[in-house]
Amino acid sequence: EPLRVALDIEIRDNSMCLDFSRTARSCAGPVNISRSTTIACCYVALKHIFKEVPANSGVLSPIEFVIPEDSLLSASAPRPVGGYTETILRIIDVIFVALSQVDPLISNGCAYGTINALSLAGHRRDGRRWVMFSFFGGGHGGHPEGDGLNHGNAPISTATIPPLEILEAAYPVLFTKW
């Protein structure tokens, strides 16, 4: 049975309420996340929509978060949380969709819906071990002014995809096609 991530959003004068009350209860599988991770995802989604949002804790003060205890988005021990990347993208998606219903001009469509990660490991010529882990992009939803990105980073952070030249300089890898 699918696990529901549902958001009701209320915009007030200078504040908003993000209410996840209709979200599924925590589950036996590893896709649960903590309350703090949920709040961090909300910040990241809002930062993607409102570029001028500063990167400080004060930015969260006008936001009320309603996240039920022991839900998918506020799991308690011993519920597993190791597969959280899929769930955090759902939070970002529902915020994008909710805000696009408030004003279609402020939010783009959802991104590609999962995490594209590459993990490689090996030994250097001198015998030292190396491990490379990097996120790579995918397609993003469109917006009123045009199509979305065809190869953007997952909106799970405000980071960017590392330049391939940096990865090639740091690890014994060579990218021949991108």
Q: What are these model-derived regions, one by one?
A:
Residues 1-178:
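Glycine/proline-enriched, intrinsically flexible loops and inter-domain linkers
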